[in-house]
Amino acid sequence: METQPASVPCVLPQDVYEFSEDRESLGRLRVSEMPSELNGGGDGSKGDGAAVVATEVSQQSNKKRKRCGVCVPCLRKEPCGTCYNCVNRSTSHQICKMRKCEQLKKKRVVPMKGVEAVDKDDAKNQAKEQVPSVKNCSESILVDGPKTDQMEAGPVNHVQEGRLKQECDSTLPSKGSEDLANQLLMEANSWLSNTAAPQDPCNKLNWDKPIIPNHIAANNNSNLEDAKNLVAFSAVAEAMSNYGMPASGTPSSISMQLYEKFNYETNQDNSGHSEGNAPSCPEDLNTLKEALALAKHGVKPPNCNCDGPECPDYLEWLENKIKSTGKGSQESPFPSLGQVSKKLVQKSYHKEQVLNLENTNVTCPSGNLPFSQNALSLAKEKNISLQTAIAIEALTQLSSALPQTNNEYPNAPSQPLINHNDQLTHFPTAKGNQLPMLPLSCNELFQNQQAQLYTGKNALPVPQSPRQASWEQNKKPGYQESEYIPENLSQSSSVLPSDASTPQKKEFLQQWVQNADLLKSPSDPMTGLKQLLGNTDEYIKSAFKGPEGLSKKIKNVKSKHTIKSIKKESADFTKMSPDQQLSQLLQGNDFHRNTQAALQQHLHHKRNLFVDSNTMEACTQEQQNWWVPNSQQAPVSKTTEKPVKERKKRRQSPSQKQVEPKPKPPRKQVQIKKPRVKEGNAVFMPVSQISLDSFRRVEKEENQVKELDLENSLPINVQPDLLGSQSIQLTGSQANLENQKTVNTQETCNENQTSIGKANNFALCVNKTNSLVAKGRCPTPSTGDSSSGQGDSANQHTNLTDVPGQNDLSCIDDKFEDLIKQFAAEFGEDFSLPGSEVPSQNGERPPKQQTSGVPQFKMPFPSQLPSENATHSNPALSNNLLTHNASHKFDSLFSSKSPKQIKIESSGAITVVSTTCSYSEENQHLDGTPTKSELPFNPTLSGFLESPLKYLTSPTKSLIDTPAKMAQAEFPTCDCVEQINEKDEGPYYTHLGSGPTVASIRELMEERFGEKGEAIRIEKVIYTGKEGKSSRGCPIAKWVIRRQSEDEKLMCLVRQRAGHHCENAVIIILIMAWEGIPRALGDSLYDDISGTITKYGNPTSRRCGLNDDRTCACQGKDPNTCGASFSFGCSWSMYFNGCKYARSKTPRKFRLIGDNPKEEEFLKDSFQDLATKVAPVYKMLAPQAYQNQANNEDVAIDCRLGLEEGRPFSGVTACMDFCAHAHKDQHNLYNGCTVVCTLTKEDNRMIGKIAEDEQLHVLPLYKVSTTDEFGSEERQLEKIRKGGIQVLSSFPREVRKLSEPAKSCRQRQLDAKKATAEKKKLQKEKLVSPDKTKQEPSDTKTCQQNPGVPQQQTKPCVKVEPSNHYNTFKYNGNGVVESYSVLGSCRPSDPYSMNSVYSYHSFYAQPNLPSVNGFHSKFALPPFGFYSFPNNPVVPNQFMNYGTGDARNSGWMNNSFEKKPELQSLADGMNQSYGSELPEQNYRRSSEVPHHYSLQNSNSQKSVGVPHRTTPAPMETTPYSNVPCYNKVIKKEPVCDPLVDPFQRSNSVHSQSPGVNHSLQTNDLSYKANGALPSSGRTNKEGPCSMFLPSDKNGLEKRDYFGVHSNVPGLKEKQWTPYGIDVPVGQRDSLDSQCSGKVWSSCKLSDSPAVMPSTVQDKNWTGRQASLNQGVKEPMPFQEKLWNSVAASGRCSTTPNDRSSVTPCAELQDKNWMSFPNPAVNSLKTDSSQNHWDPYSLDDNMDDGQSKSVKEEEDEEEIWSDSEHNFLDGNIGGVAVAPGHGSILIECARRELHATTPLKKPNRCHPTRISLVFYQHKNLNQPNHGLALWEAKMKQLAERARVKEEEAAKLGIKQEVKSLGKKRKWGGAATTETPPVEKKDFIPTRQAATSLTDSTTTAFSYAYTKVTGPYSRFI
């Protein structure tokens, strides 16, 4: 490794300067460093050296050194982007290491040299430097403000200044020195390890600074002090940044020293070190080993130019040193008093006190210092003085503990640590002066703090995470040994210190949470690392874990070594021996350091993140603290003495807030309250249900326990002191600051120790604080008791606060109860816990403890864990705490369960505590009280990461683990391409198989399949991304891959990923097992499935069944035979948001239409057996995909198919001649596949024989490779010649087209709903209309019946049974087919009703589809339009019950004509009905115009303009009998009226109907608006138009909507034969009589004409018209005009059908109508007598007519599609596979676009291909079909409803308002509709008048108004 010419020391100043954030801070840093160095060099002449250095530094800082501009780094223009500075550019203001001028680096050597000399001469200078560095570190740790500002703001500056002055460094501003030291340390860290550099909280590479070497070299006090400061700072910094590096500063400094020595030895020229540097370098084995470990983990000297994370030369040198070195000097300068004082000052200790402490420490010889093993080992390993090591360890421990105390995250943690360190440091420095402080080493202090933190009683509530445990264990050796227990505490009980430590641990945890870096600072690198790495997002959790582990380990160690030493050492101040702690730290740190070394870089990176996280954590803690009433906040206020630090401390330490509980906590509570309210709207428990009593009880119990613990743990005298001292501490500013800090730490500890630790620690702190305050010192006792002392003081304060708080718990409870009540509804869980916890903790403390015990948040039972910790720490206290806390834990969890108990949510590997549950009832205890630091309450990223579900507001989310979704496979890391672009190379997935080459794929498949050679065929396909499809957007194939021979068993399609040569360069996209199932099984399945499903199956409408325009009829048009898909097994329900059987007690996975249990069982057996047999094949061929799908089998076995273990499928879809357009199965399981079992027709089961009609499976985005798997083009051509690959050419093909776009399921559903609503309204109106009908003229008796459908029903003239129609159509069982509009309806029960989702019978099957579409459309076409549309015999109007399902008549055919309508009325009805049919047909044409409204009277047109098929379509699937027109009794108004006005009205009303439109316009005069039958045409509410309209009212409404047409055909005022023939009245009568003789349905009439070919129509029309006329008894004289007009109107009305079958319509209109007039009537008479056809009886000529009309319509619909463009572009894909009978195809349908080609003649009754698609839905992974989810959802909905109700009640809003609103809507709609009706009535104006005059009419208009209400838009 090439070292930079400048030795690290030299580089350091420069680096610091270069990297310093600003000159000022740099100057300060330099001043502090240099003075310390100079001081060190000055051999104790601190002042002189300091002055000189200060001068130099100030000069340097004042005059920024300029780059030489000639060295390589200067010439380098671009930053490397990889070094720490570059990576952390935003935070590190230093230049890229690669661009750092060599001269600047060298330049720094001068100060270093001086410093080194000084170091050798005077260690105090280093100590001083260390102090500033420590301050800097803390400052860097501090989140509140700039390090400089913080340092300046901190009283430590004064102390430092005083100390510096004492050290003769008066010229240096303490802050500047601190900054300098910090920067130096930072640089040293970075220097020692580039990664370590980040360790420096300041984010500056201070390791480069020679100060560290100075520490090493210097043994004098100044050097020791500087070293201590630097080490402490580095330790804190590294602890903060790398946590894993306990004394990262120390190791860094050691490393720097070592590296300097290394440079000195290897590159003396380049090393700027003085000769003393090398000798000064500590070379003890521990130090060397530690440096080696660091170096191995990427901690390189700053000058190292080696590439990579390690410096081989340096490593080798270290190894050699280790070999040659026996033991390094254990002496290491203790952290300088300056450091300690700085820290103390930073902690807000009085300057005088700090100085006193320093003096005392100075007086204390290092020998007197109780050194922890960690400190000793640290000193040895790092080659630093024992004092330095102690300082480092103390700082490390303190830093870990300090985070709790930090008001400013960095400062508070570091300050408490520093305080301990200061104490310790001073102790060592004093070496004899401060025995009390000395008893605990820094490590001990740190450990004690942490131990207390972790092991204190408060720790009990805080569960220890394994990480924490391990961390604590690692740290414990030192901590336990060094655990300091103030004399009071030790006297009271060893447990108390443990408690204190535990609370501190808790605090530490809090601080950890708040300050990940600080938390990491504890000596245990593992814990820090774990916390940093593992708990970045889970500071609380990590805190819990770390503290727990620590508390346990610390408890053990402390109980052994620490407690003893602590008791001995804790006499006065902290009595923690830094050496002991250091030794412990070193012992545990060897391991930790290794870990740290490994994680150091990562931690450093994390540190930057964590700094923010710490800030967030602090905020979180504050938020947590909100739980604590003002008492906690009051301490915060005290902390506020030091605005920034204290504030941070406040944030950090809930206990501190508790200690200073006055106003802020409530504020925070409010804030938190608000956020929580925001976070959780629906809490598990309503406020009313929240029981605070349990919490209070728990709190009381906890308080009692705490009090008992305090009493037990604390000496009796101490307890009073606790209370008194608490106030004292609060009183003393230093005490306050320290207490605040302590409190912060304490809070952390307290959270752990909450019950006991708080009181104990608090008492200790109070006593010590009191003594300290009295002494004028910062309450070092608590601080000195790093873990116990400081934590104790904090805990004491907390405990005191808690004790009062406990006493105040009732008050707090009241407050919290209020809060809880306020938040309970939304956060009830959290609030419940807070309430209980707060009471137990003092109310304030508990929340904070929870805050500090953030671990509680993570730990299900933080209280329990903390109890354990406390127990470990203090056997007595721990026992008490454990017992009490455990009881509380359990009580909290069980007895004091908050209404919202903690819910442990787990999703995959993530387990989250319930969001608003305040974590757990145990948390309700001290620790249980959620604190802000518990993130769940804070909307922070870390909080979210901590508990994602907590941010879910719904109880369902918190209660339930949402279905685990397997993440999409990540792209493999390969260097083949810069970026994987699936658009270019195709979708990436490997679960079917992958390999580097095609040959590897063959090997793979041969291994899987077990055969080789020809048995396996591999075809290469190329992804083009261009979809091959016909001009109409339907699937096409360009290449067909076929099975070549029987020898071929397996075929795989593989794709070469463009540009890839990696292990996944070739992936399998499709596997075809030609013989997937036995032939016999396939044959039987084909027969069984085709027979059963065809008869009883319920087709499923699929979007992929249509092209983009939704106009293709690829499935076929015949609803009985069109291709369709049928779903079985479990499938996803949008309603349940889970399996559709979520609420099914007895799921019918293989449900068929109707009640066919035998068939269902048979089908079930077939599919289950098949699934059982297919699964092994799937497993064999695609094991990974199979496994992915079978993973959750045991969990969701209810949603799986198969009879044996290994069920990869949740559902199966049977596609029968179903053409699936290109699509992806987006909802399939991630990394799963669809397995398609193909069954083909008998003529397509031979290999090598291409059937006349076949269906192919297409991959539209792929093209076939020009070479075979071996790269041979010849072989590929040979395959083509042999038929293995069929190359298709462009050719035009006849395709089916829908006249109108098919409606989507959503549209159909909406229409159905609207129709239903209208039907209901119509039914209501019908009830009223009969009376009105009665009111109508007697001559219109029969017609009058129209208005009164009930009358009609009661007096049926003609009864029609729609059921027959259905039966005729064979829709009884297969209503599905009809309903299967464009692939079937979802509701086979009523496939024919508008209500049915698929009320529109398969458009493919509907010859008159256009009409159907039109009718289906929202247009208010007359029902006839819809159902006359069924003119196609295939789909009678009844099936199209758009209007037929008229609720009013509920099947006029059944009852509508119960009262025989006059023949005229019937004729009118008939005319309208069939007229409408004809018109429907015409309507197709006219509809093309205005939707079958076009030609009618202008008014009628206007009215027609409103396509009102709403009613008709919406009508139930009611048979035609139910069709309004059918159901309706054709009602007539008085003949005179009907002839004219009524006709006009009807005409106007019906004018909308297309058929009528034309006729009306042309023949308007003849029958005016509607074919003016007095009542039947116009008046019948249920008249012919009503046929079209569900009810007469609807008819009117719809007539209005439909226009004349609906009513006109049969409703002309004049009685006209339904035939529209001018038949004399007598004839009409005869016709009527004839018609009446036979039950007939106008629908049928309409059906037949529309459906039948012209000839058929002619025939039917004549016969039927006659029959109609016959049926129509009152033959009002039919005007030929009317008839003609009717014919015309028929045309018009037919127009709608005309769209679908224009020709038939035209013929009917022309021929039929022409022929119909009189001859038709005659023929009608004859035919009617013979062929009185029932529109429902599909038999009468209907079949013929249907077939003919269907054929004609199909012919008309068929168009030619050309795919030539696909073949012109060779890159357009279209690779198809011709699946054979019994073959199994496996593909990733989720990722690959796939399709199936349409069949020429689809016939699902005898399907060409049955595709059984087995799949697994991605989310069907819940047991019992996801019933729990559903129930949770229902609960959630109920809760929401409850909340809404409560809100409504609060607002005084009545829930009825909504219904009123709806009514208003309806009313408004009705009102709106009414005007539209009037508009429709433009021609219907008369109708409107009639409405006014005629009750019937009025009813209609009203009904119209109501019905149209929301549907006014249809008008």
UniProtKB/Swiss-Prot annotation:
Underlying gene: tet3-b
Domain of life: Eukaryota
Known tissue expression: Detected in embryo (at protein level). Detected in embryonic head, in developing brain and eye.
Species of origin: Xenopus laevis (African clawed frog)
Catalytic activity: a 5-methyl-2'-deoxycytidine in DNA + 2-oxoglutarate + O2 = a 5-hydroxymethyl-2'-deoxycytidine in DNA + succinate + CO2; a 5-hydroxymethyl-2'-deoxycytidine in DNA + 2-oxoglutarate + O2 = a 5-formyl-2'-deoxycytidine in DNA + succinate + CO2 + H2O; a 5-formyl-2'-deoxycytidine in DNA + 2-oxoglutarate + O2 = a 5-carboxyl-2'-deoxycytidine in DNA + succinate + CO2 + H(+)
Major subcellular site: nucleus
Biased composition (Low complexity): 779-793
Location(s), subcellular: Nucleus; Chromosome
Polar residues bias locations: 629-638, 838-854, 864-880, 1340-1355, 1494-1503, 1720-1732
GO molecular function: 5-methylcytosine dioxygenase activity; methyl-CpG binding; RNA polymerase II cis-regulatory region sequence-specific DNA binding; zinc ion binding
Coiled-coil boundaries: 1827-1860
Disordered, as annotated region: 28-49, 629-679, 776-806, 831-880, 1298-1356, 1469-1516, 1719-1753
Claim: DNA-binding is one of the keywords in the record: yes
Record's comment describing the protein's domains: Binds target DNA that contains at least one unmethylated cytosine via the CXXC-type zinc-finger domain.
Protein name: Methylcytosine dioxygenase tet3-B
Zinc finger (CXXC-type): 61-102
UniProt keyword list: Chromatin regulator, Chromosome, Coiled coil, Developmental protein, Dioxygenase, DNA-binding, Iron, Metal-binding, Nucleus, Oxidoreductase, Zinc, Zinc-finger
Family assignment from sequence similarity: Belongs to the TET family.
